[in-house]
């Protein structure tokens, strides 16, 4: 079976020195530690600096991103890319569907309206075992995957801006 992870692109000259924002939901600390490690490794390898903001849950991620983008712009230090990290585990109520769908929709709305490269690393799973398989950098590395997606979109944005 093919490796499901996005490949790391090696030519990072056009994005080196860019600034990224990671917003993580700390609902499951151990899982978030693993996802954050994967995302940070990808950003560092690509030559980006980054800030991390922590929020209580996945639904708070889009609002925190919007607030941070506005503040960074106001201070003359805009972010070039954003990575959202979180974990939503299915329970016995429809809360899972609401959190999963609304956080994803809000992130897509932000990416499109703000024209910001955004990697969605909010994993949605049925079990803790599935969460761990997706969080660990040695397995599916969804934190790293979200960072690679944001980096790929940043490359596209910069190439198209050049004309």
Swiss-Prot record:
Source organism per UniProt: Rhodopseudomonas palustris (strain BisA53)
HAMAP family: Lumazine_synth
Biological processes, Gene Ontology terms: riboflavin biosynthetic process
Gene: ribH
Keywords for this protein: Riboflavin biosynthesis, Transferase
Catalytic activity field: (2S)-2-hydroxy-3-oxobutyl phosphate + 5-amino-6-(D-ribitylamino)uracil = 6,7-dimethyl-8-(1-D-ribityl)lumazine + phosphate + 2 H2O + H(+)
Pathway this chain belongs to: Cofactor biosynthesis; riboflavin biosynthesis; riboflavin from 2-hydroxy-3-oxobutyl phosphate and 5-amino-6-(D-ribitylamino)uracil: step 1/2
Protein name: 6,7-dimethyl-8-ribityllumazine synthase
Family: Belongs to the DMRL synthase family.
NCBIfam families: lumazine-synth (TIGR00114)
GO (cellular component) term, any one: riboflavin synthase complex
Lineage, highest ranks first: Bacteria, Pseudomonadati, Pseudomonadota, Alphaproteobacteria, Hyphomicrobiales
């Amino acid at each position: 079976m093919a490796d499901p992870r996005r490949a790391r692109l090696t030519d990072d000259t056009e994005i080196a020195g860019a600034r990224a924002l990671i917003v993580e939901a700390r609902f499951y600390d151990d899982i978030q530690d693993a996802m954050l490690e994967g995302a940070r490794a990808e950003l560092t390898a690509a030559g980006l600096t980054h800030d991390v903001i922590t929020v209580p849950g996945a639904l708070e991620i889009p609002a925190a991103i919007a607030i941070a983008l506005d503040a960074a712009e106001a201070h003359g230090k805009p972010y070039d890319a954003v990575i959202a990290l979180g974990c939503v585990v299915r329970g016995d109520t429809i809360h899972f569907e609401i959190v999963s769908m609304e956080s994803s929709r809000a992130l897509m709305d932000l990416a499109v309206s703000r024209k910001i490269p955004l990697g969605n690393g909010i994993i949605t799973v049925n079990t803790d075992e599935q969460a761990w398989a997706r969080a660990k950098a040695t397995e599916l590395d969804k934190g790293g995957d979200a960072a690679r997606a944001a980096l790929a979109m940043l490359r596209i944005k910069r190439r198209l801006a050049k004309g």
